[in-house]
């Protein structure tokens, strides 16, 4: 099983340019041919691209240095050397590229069509053809190729999830994500079972609309300061559109728990408190008393919209998904439904036209 690695430092070296050639024409009946040394080829670039099948940076643990191919040297007859082959490195979507020495953010992969030339190959050296002059008809020197660029990089992965599940340890985050997506996280009845984020895809409206959801390891008071599993995973909810605050319904003080969680998010990144959210009470199956559940909800309804569920028994999961549709994706779903309706309308019109054509042909025949 691959380990979840979301940060790693690597070194990349673009290819050196090829050397220019020192060469002279050698032809029959031409005793003193002029210079015809070709230029060296450009060194290969180091290019980074996203890969949708990657979810972790673990492949960069065993190898930390990467070098592109050098340009080939020039040859005679003014032929340039071949360009060095580019080196392509793949990273998960959501990876940010930092200069490890300056701390500057160089690139942020947010779509799968992007690519980033992080280090450019050196230019090839000029062949001796370029150095012929009135005072030097037979130059016996050429330029060496330039060195390729070098970069010391930090790759930092921030999951591109649409929804983040935040809660205390053992609130049932992994169980919930396993029930509403195809993800299969480790599930157990003890705190900190989840040691790394889990990502799943939720399919809605007959699979015409999808969104991604991530659960991160349980947050305890002081997480933003490094306590517990600390802030190492909080960055994975920085890009989310909405947050589910998930609680064990048997908690003694859900209001205080919510305040603590939101305070930790605020300490880490105040912007997170501006995201729309839902409050989810999990494990309502531990008592078979709807009135008791209603009583708990009545005490916290002033904090936000509350949905009571049992992830384990799959109780009210559709109700939760509908609430997420409304709170986080209402405009997007409306656009998708409108587009689908228009496509169906066009398809029906085409069928009518084809039917009219067939009927017309039958009448003529």
From Swiss-Prot:
Residues 2-160 form the Obg domain. SUPFAM superfamilies: Obg GTP-binding protein N-terminal domain, P-loop containing nucleoside triphosphate hydrolases. InterPro entries: G_OBG, GTP-bd, GTP-bd_Obg/CgtA, GTP1-OBG_CS, GTP1_OBG_dom, GTP1_OBG_dom_sf, OBG_GTPase, P-loop_NTPase. One of its GO terms (biological process) is ribosome biogenesis. Its EC number is 3.6.5.-. The keyword Lyase does not apply. GO terms for cellular component: cytoplasm. Residues 161-329 form the OBG-type G domain. Keywords: Cytoplasm, GTP-binding, Hydrolase, Magnesium, Metal-binding, Nucleotide-binding. Its cofactor is Mg(2+). One of its GO terms (molecular function) is magnesium ion binding. It is an enzyme of class 3 (hydrolase). Mg(2+) binds at residues 174, 194. It is found in: Cytoplasm. GTP binds at residues 167-174, 192-196, 215-218, 282-285, 310-312. An essential GTPase which binds GTP, GDP and possibly (p)ppGpp with moderate affinity, with high nucleotide exchange rates and a fairly low GTP hydrolysis rate. Plays a role in control of the cell cycle, stress response, ribosome biogenesis and in those bacteria that undergo differentiation, in morphogenesis control. Monomer. NCBIfam families: Obg_CgtA, PRK12297.1, PRK12299.1, small_GTP. HAMAP family: GTPase_Obg. Belongs to the TRAFAC class OBG-HflX-like GTPase superfamily. OBG GTPase family. This is GTPase Obg. It comes from Leptospira borgpetersenii serovar Hardjo-bovis (strain JB197).
């Amino acid at each position: 099983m691959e380990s979840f690695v979301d940060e790693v430092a690597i070194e990349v070296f673009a290819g050196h340019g090829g050397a220019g050639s020192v060469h002279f024409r050698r032809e029959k009946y031409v005793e003193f041919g002029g210079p015809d040394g070709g230029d060296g080829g450009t060194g290969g670039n180091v290019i980074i691209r996203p890969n949708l099948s990657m979810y972790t940076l673990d492949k960069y643990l065993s190898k930390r240095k990467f070098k592109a191919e050098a340009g080939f040297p020039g040859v005679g007859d003014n032929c340039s050397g071949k360009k060095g082959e580019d080196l392509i490195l793949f990273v998960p979507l959501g990876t940010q590229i930092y200069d490890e020495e300056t701390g500057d953010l160089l690139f942020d992969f947010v779509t799968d069509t992007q690519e980033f030339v992080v280090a450019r190959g050196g230019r090839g050296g000029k062949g001796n053809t370029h150095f012929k002059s009135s005072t030097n008809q037979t130059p016996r020197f050429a330029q060496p190729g330039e060195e390729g660029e070098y970069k010391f990089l930090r790759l930092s992965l921030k999951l591109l999830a649409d929804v983040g599940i935040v809660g205390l340890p053992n609130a049932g985050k992994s169980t919930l994500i396993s029930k509403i997506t195809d993800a299969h996280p480790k599930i157990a009845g003890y705190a900190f079972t989840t040691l790394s984020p889990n990502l799943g895809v939720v399919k809605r409206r007959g699979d015409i609309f999808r969104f991604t959801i991530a659960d991160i390891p349980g947050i305890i008071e002081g997480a933003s300061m490094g306590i517990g599993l600390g802030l190492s995973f909080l960055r994975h909810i920085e890009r989310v559109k909405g947050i589910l605050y998930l609680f064990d319904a048997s908690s003694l003080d859900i209001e205080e728990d919510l305040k603590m969680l939101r305070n930790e998010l605020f300490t880490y990144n105040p912007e997170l408190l501006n995201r729309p959210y839902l409050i989810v009470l999990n494990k309502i199956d531990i008592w078979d008393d709807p009135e008791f559940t209603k009583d708990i909800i009545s005490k916290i309804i002033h904090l936000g919209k509350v949905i009571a569920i049992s992830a384990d028994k799959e109780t009210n999961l559709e109700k939760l998904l509908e609430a997420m549709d409304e709170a986080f994706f209402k405009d997007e779903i409306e656009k998708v439904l409108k587009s689908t309706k228009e496509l169906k309308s066009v398809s029906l019109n085409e069928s009518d036209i084809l039917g009219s054509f067939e009927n017309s042909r039958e009448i003529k025949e």
